[in-house]
Amino acid sequence: MAGLRPIPARLLPDAMVVRVPDGRGGFAEGVAVSHVRFARTQSVVDDGHRGADAGAGKVYVDALNSDGAFEVPAGSRVDIGGHSYLVAECRRCEDFNGHVHHWELTVR
């Protein structure tokens, strides 16, 4: 049985910079990962001072078509489109042969 096809590059229009925790309370130097997809879920706040925050969402990183792809640990920071997000969860999605197909990062 053949593995799953990679996520098409045309569906991966975004880029991000990943900073993993350095073990000393800070973050390591940023690593660029291009050809990812950021799907934002924006929350609205009605407090008279602001209408919306940067939101949260999911980042899809393809194992083959995302340049610089790696398994991003929870607790890392990712910068996408001028906003910085915390990686709350990294879910590894495998094909039928047990190889990594893509990762889904839950960010907030």
Feature-to-residue mapping (PLM):
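Short, conserved turn/kink motifs that form compact alpha/beta structural patches or helix kinks used as
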Residues: A9, R19-R108
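N-terminal intrinsically disordered, low-complexity, charge/repeat-rich segments that act as generic
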Residues: M1-P13
